[in-house]
Amino acid sequence: MLMPKRTKYRKQMKGRNRGKAHRGNSIAFGDIAIKAIEHGRIDSRQIESARVAMTRHVKRAGKVWIRVFPDKPLTAKPLETRMGKGKGSVEKWVMNIKPGRIVYEMLGIEEGLAREALALAQSKLPFKTKIVTCESENEIY
């Protein structure tokens, strides 16, 4: 599971996920990628399950880049606990995703096979995405 080695503070406020992605919104390493087209929140389990689905489909050929990292702690109180008594403990690590963010990239795989693998990964993600290539990347999302 992906999570930071250490953080300055154990818990964070919820915050708001607004606007478009200005960083990480273009293909940097591969030639085909998954791009988010709506707001969402992805946790370390979802990142890993999508990665496993892709790499198994292409039989570990080529290279896959994960362009997101869950650095925000998400807290939860135990079930059947009364309100109060402070904030709950950290349950999982998440990352807020904005429209336009590149989530995964692939290189060195035939395009048809890469599209199939990325489609498998898309089904594991909790927000709408689209598959982009270096040529089609500049389209509006």
From Swiss-Prot:
InterPro entries: Ribosomal_uL16, Ribosomal_uL16_bact-type, Ribosomal_uL16_CS, Ribosomal_uL16_dom, Ribosomal_uL16_sf. It comes from the Bacteria. GO terms for biological process: translation. This is Large ribosomal subunit protein uL16. Belongs to the universal ribosomal protein uL16 family. Binds 23S rRNA and is also seen to make contacts with the A and possibly P site tRNAs. PANTHER family: 50S/60S RIBOSOMAL PROTEIN L16, LARGE RIBOSOMAL SUBUNIT PROTEIN UL16M. Part of the 50S ribosomal subunit. It comes from Helicobacter acinonychis (strain Sheeba). Residues 1-23 are annotated as: Disordered. Keywords: Ribonucleoprotein, Ribosomal protein, RNA-binding, rRNA-binding, tRNA-binding. It holds the Pfam family Ribosomal_L16.
